[in-house]
Amino acid sequence: MSVRGGGAPLLDAVLAGRACCAEETVDAEPAGLFPEEEALVARAVPGRRREFATARLCARRALAALGAAPAPLLRGRRGAPAWPAGVIGSITHCAGFRGAAVAPADRVLALGIDAEPHAPLPRGVLGAVAFGPERARLRVLAARRSDICWDRLLFSAKESVYKAWSGYGGAWLGFEDAEASWLLDGTAEGPRARVPGQGEEHRLGGRGRPPVPRAPARAGGGAGAHGGRSGVAAGRFRVRILVPPPPVRPDGFAFPQVLHGRWLVRDGLLLTAVTVPRTALPRPIPTAPKEPF
């Protein structure tokens, strides 16, 4: 289920019905916040207060679709929203877009969403978010579809993965700790793909990671409001975690080493989402061997 201020729901397209989501392109007034939430942004500039209020409004609408009663949504570990018990969720915002997605914790282990302007990353940032094989794949993909900002897509995919990882309880994850590949129009670019010149990816923060400037938020939909390239494209991506996963939970569920997600480019925006269904059980809890008689 999804709701939106107007037009087709973008988040629902990348979540594929696995979560309740809500999104807005016009900012709300902070008057809709609970007092506890207002205190979190009491010293923020007006634009940040409106951005915060709209994202919280989206979260409440998505939670209402799950049957949750309205309540303050405060900050938890690492500044991410502290979702109600029994709920997994994620929030995202960029210029001209605010969104939230939630799912029952008994059906989804982890969830991450990210929205970005569909525009190239600032100069010098790609080297901090992608390593050699990924950059080689980006060059191949750019030759095939130059209308897609593949560098921004890589950044966004890893952002979604980090939100899912962090929400699950994982330790710090750097950009260099995850490797991304993509699927578009039936053509995959993955770790085994042949690349010319080769023998045969609150957010992710790699060590020494430079900040990625974001365009000033302003209301209104459409490509002009986001300052990015227009057009429509969609596909899937895969991200392989290169560090040990969080410990297996007592109920036997474990965070997978490989995550699969969806991406969408539309109206000057780029969106990505990752969900880890609770059916994912890559490894059971080891049991102690029985003592011999």
PLM segments and residue spans:
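Core catalytic alpha/beta fold that binds nucleotide/phospho-ligands
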Residues: 1-293
